[in-house]
Swiss-Prot record:
Keyword field contains Nucleotidyltransferase: no
Compartments, as annotated in UniProt: Cytoplasm; Membrane
InterPro entries the record matches: Reprimo_fam
Glycosylation, residue list: 7, 18
Name recorded for this polypeptide: Protein reprimo
Main location, first listed in the record: cytoplasm
Length: 109
């Protein structure tokens, strides 16, 4: 029997025997708590400086996105206002004043 094949079946048997333990081992192997630093001590998580930098970057990104949305709405509103004024002027040019309006304007003079 091939020893490598026997080893593979043993590993597969361990994973299939108790899947919750295998899942826990897999989760523990890939967390930040399992990372070992050069000093040999396990690092508990990100340090305070990197958390501060991440928070500042998040705030900067949110400010840029907020300004983009605000200016987008502003310029969209201005564009619609300009178009509506143009449409009103277009309708006013096509409209002819009635003769009654002229009679009222000319009457008092």
């Amino acid at each position: 029997m091939n020893p490598a094949l026997g080893n593979q079946t043993d590993v597969a048997g361990l994973f299939l025997a108790n899947s919750s333990e295998a899942l826990e081992r897999a989760m523990r192997c890939c967390t930040q708590a399992s990372v070992v630093t050069d000093d040999g001590f396990a690092e508990g998580g990100p340090d305070e400086r990197s958390l501060y930098i991440m928070r500042v970057v998040q705030i900067a990104v949110m400010c840029v996105l907020s300004l983009t949305v605000v200016f987008g709405i502003f310029f969209l509103g201005c564009n619609l206002l300009i178009k509506s004024e143009g449409m009103i002027n277009f309708l006013v040019k096509d409209r002819r004043p009635s003769k009654e309006v002229e009679a009222v304007v000319v009457g008092p003079y």
